[in-house]
A protein has these predicted regions:
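Short edge beta-strand/loop segments characteristic of extracellular beta-sandwich folds
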Residues: 19-23, 93
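Residue-level detector of short, conserved catalytic/binding motifs and their immediate flanks
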Residues: 14-18, 35, 90
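General structural signal for secondary-structure boundaries
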Residues: 1-4, 49-52, 97
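Glycine-rich, aromatic-bearing surface loops/beta-hairpins
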Residues: 109-131
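Short, surface-exposed ligand- or partner-binding patches at beta-edge/loop junctions that are enriched
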Residues: 85-114
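Short, solvent-exposed beta-strand/turn "edge" segments of beta-rich domains on protein surfaces
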Residues: 1-17, 26-30, 81-83
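Residue-level detector of beta-strand face positions
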Residues: 21, 38, 104-106
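The feature marks short-to-medium sequence segments in extracytoplasmic or secretory-pathway proteins
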Residues: 23-84, 88, 123-130
Length: 131
């Protein structure tokens, strides 16, 4: 099966998953680039946990490759261009937060990223914990 061991679950519980779906309704290319997204709480930046954060955590937890692959499929791509009517979704991960935070998502537009930057701000996002 694809069950996660307790050590891996414990690592996951230290984090917060934000799972947006991006749908390009414009005629222009829309660029999803997670490095252009910011997270903050109380005026302080929150560092996003990139894909490269996880392999060492999984090694420490003794998580088999099959489960690592399953987890990887759930993550938002780091970079992706979206054309008219294309969508992409997945999880973006930050350290667990006890209070509300803001997510600012910036998207370049145009095939060469030379169009206007579109920005979407979500305020008051809260993590769900197991407690």
């Amino acid at each position: 099966g694809r069950e996660f061991n307790q050590a891996a679950i414990d690592r996951i519980l230290e984090t917060c998953f934000i799972t947006p779906i991006i749908h390009n309704k414009t005629l222009d290319a829309l660029w999803l680039e997670l490095d252009n997204w910011q997270f903050s709480a109380g005026g302080q930046a929150i560092k996003r946990l990139r894909r490269d954060y996880w392999p060492e955590k999984w090694r420490q937890a003794g998580l088999p490759q099959a489960q690592q692959s399953t987890f990887g499929w759930t993550l938002m791509p780091e970079v992706r261009d979206l054309r008219l009517d294309e969508s992409v979704g997945g999880s973006v991960v930050i350290p667990m937060q006890s209070g509300p935070f803001t997510m600012t998502a910036n998207f370049h537009t145009g095939l060469d990223k030379e169009g206007e930057i579109k920005t979407i701000v979500f305020e008051g996002i809260q993590c769900v914990s197991s407690e």
